[in-house]
A protein has these predicted regions:
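A polyanion-binding, active-site-adjacent surface
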Residues: 10, 22-170, 174-177, 182-191, ...
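Generic N-terminal amphipathic, Lys/Arg-enriched alpha-helix
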Residues: 8-20
């Protein structure tokens, strides 16, 4: 199995390999690997190779409770760490993430953190999934439609098919296109505007963090501690 992911990252957790084994051997994934090898020979690609599958290594398949869907990794130096909306330690939170923290503050009274590193959420079962897992430096959208969306759609479908009671947070029009992949009879879908400032504050007041925890608690599942510090 390691050979099938060589050139990208052989360190995706075994729990995911079991449910995604057909993806790693599919022709589109071979093409994606070749594309990434060519990209890396000419350009800087984010996140670093060892972080491409960070979302899966922090949130094992068996531990998924919540899924937050993003679009692309951040394309600035040092920002992307493989988790949607998250940035590496020491990096100033981008505007969308700042708005997420503002909503957390008004929803649950959680102080706005200094860090934008969301690994503590991922470690508790929040799958922070970008639809596209890589990007060329300073070139947003550059790795779209190269195969990643096929792979991450399969991830969403696998979670939907094999699990139940998962809370999917779909923020913005793009994330909401993924609703068709989710079995609404088995899972919970919460929708809101994107936290980007371009949405002119429409994200605020969604209370998705408290709503998520109420859903989890109602099922007898330990809620998420959304605090980062």
């Amino acid at each position: 199995m390691a050979a099938s992911t060589a050139g990208i990252n052989p360190y995706i957790h075994e729990s995911w390999k079991k449910v995604l084994i057909n993806e790693f051997t599919a022709p589109y994934f071979m093409d994606l690997k070749q594309f990434l090898v060519a990209e890396k020979s000419k350009h800087i690609v984010y996140p670093p190779g060892n972080a491409i599958f960070s979302a899966f290594n922090h949130t094992h398949f068996n531990n998924v409770k919540v899924v937050i869907i993003g679009q692309d990794p951040y394309h600035g130096p040092g920002q992307a760490n493989g988790l949607s909306f998250s940035v590496s330690p020491g990096i100033t939170p981008p505007p969308s993430l700042k708005n997420i923290f503002k909503e957390l503050n008004t929803d649950l009274g959680i102080p706005i953190p200094y860090t934008g590193n969301l690994e503590p959420w991922a470690d508790q079962g929040v799958l922070l999934l970008n639809a596209t897992l890589t990007v060329r430096a300073n070139t947003p959208g550059s790795h779209q439609k190269k195969g990643w969306e096929h792979f991450t759609d399969a991830v969403i479908k696998a979670v939907s098919d094999h699990k139940k009671g998962i809370v999917f947070l779909l923020w913005g029009n793009f994330a909401q296109t993924k609703e068709e992949l989710i079995d609404k009879d088995k899972h919970f879908i919460l929708k809101a505007a994107h936290p980007s400032p371009l949405a002119r504050g429409a994200f605020f007041g969604c209370k998705h963090f408290s709503k998520t925890n109420k859903i989890l608690e109602h099922q007898g599942v330990k809620p998420i501690d959304w605090r980062l510090e």
